[in-house]
């Protein structure tokens, strides 16, 4: 524990926390041709590659992911949630933060139901997370 005189000479330093989704924390100013720091909840991007990946040890599957070039120029790997998708190269998508625990290097999710990423078809529960509209038959009077 520091003494009073030690605290007088050098005050306590705040801890610097490293971001878990760094690509969402800055933008590109095309007029000045430089990065500017600001946080955004999502960013738009263009898919450069859409393919599958196998997860880490205890799990087994073919997880769908896309390589996305964001509007700030960064290229990130983003997971495509839900069953089935219509994404291909040059699709415009919305990317949010959030890692996939069993896929190394995947720190972002693609938002379903926004831009070119269509919502999951025939989804009845948890629809808001997958961009699925409320079915006509289930509407109340």
Swiss-Prot record:
The modification 3-methylthioaspartic acid is found at residue 102. Pfam families: Ribosom_S12_S23. Residues 1-11 have a biased composition (Polar residues). GO terms for molecular function: rRNA binding; structural constituent of ribosome; tRNA binding. GO terms for biological process: translation. GO terms for cellular component: small ribosomal subunit. Residues 1-22 are annotated as: Disordered. Keywords: Methylation, Ribonucleoprotein, Ribosomal protein, RNA-binding, rRNA-binding, tRNA-binding. InterPro entries: NA-bd_OB-fold, Ribosomal_uS12, Ribosomal_uS12_bac. With S4 and S5 plays an important role in translational accuracy. Interacts with and stabilizes bases of the 16S rRNA that are involved in tRNA selection in the A site and with the mRNA backbone. Located at the interface of the 30S and 50S subunits, it traverses the body of the 30S subunit contacting proteins on the other side and probably holding the rRNA structure together. The combined cluster of proteins S8, S12 and S17 appears to hold together the shoulder and platform of the 30S subunit. NCBIfam families: rpsL_bact (TIGR00981). HAMAP family: Ribosomal_uS12_B. PANTHER family: 30S RIBOSOMAL PROTEIN S12 FAMILY MEMBER. Belongs to the universal ribosomal protein uS12 family. Part of the 30S ribosomal subunit. Contacts proteins S8 and S17. May interact with IF1 in the 30S initiation complex. This is Small ribosomal subunit protein uS12. It comes from Acholeplasma laidlawii (strain PG-8A).
């Amino acid at each position: 524990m520091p003494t009073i005189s030690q605290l007088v000479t050098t005050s306590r330093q705040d801890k610097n926390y490293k971001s878990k989704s760094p690509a969402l924390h800055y933008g590109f100013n095309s007029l000045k041709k430089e990065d500017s720091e600001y946080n955004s909840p999502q960013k738009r991007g263009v898919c450069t590659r859409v393919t599958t990946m196998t997860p880490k040890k205890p799990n087994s599957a073919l997880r769908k992911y896309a390589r996305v070039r964001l509007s700030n120029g960064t290229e990130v790997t983003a997971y495509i949630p839900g069953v089935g998708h219509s994404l291909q190269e040059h699709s415009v998508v919305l990317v949010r933060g959030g890692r996939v625990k069993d896929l190394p290097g995947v720190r972002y999710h693609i938002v379903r139901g926004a831009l070119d990423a269509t919502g999951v078809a025939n989804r009845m529960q948890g629809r808001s997370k997958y961009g699925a509209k409320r079915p006509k038959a289930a509407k109340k009077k």
